[in-house]
Amino acid sequence: RQMCIRDRKYDYDTTFFRFADYRTGEENAMQGAASGRTVSITHSDHYKTSFRYDPQARTYKMQMYSRISGKFENTVDELNAKQLSFDNLLVCFAPIERYPGDSGDVQQVSYISGGDAYCFSRGGVQHGRWEKASPEHPLRVYDKTGAEMLFNRGKTYLAIVDDDEWSNFSYQ
């Protein structure tokens, strides 16, 4: 299977990330990983998310900051009234700028620059780097040794965060 973009051909016989193979029971147990049971991400002054790991469900429960209440509130799916949860969180830092001359809040992300990446799963965190060869290529995430990170199967929350917000990012 191939996909044509701008008269270029790229093989897309893989998933967006390198997911654990369900056929073999493969899993990233996050052995030796630092604790990543709570995660706080500031995207901007008005957009903040937090996640808390639920060891029973093996997922991260999502909350968003409400300027009205002044506190974090559960992020709930309108269709089923359940709190959103994710098996993996991927936080990627990148240079983000406003489009020149744009009067709204449209952002331009430098996707091909790469940057720091934090992968959270099973209550742990792996620090590494993300890269994209071009806007048309898939995003790749590598650990400190240069090996491509293995993501556990399930829903993955991907956050692209401005480098300027790095000091407001925390986990424990």
Each predicted region: which residue ranges?
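A surface/extracellular/periplasmic glyco- and lipid-processing/surface-interacting theme
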Residues: 2, 6-172
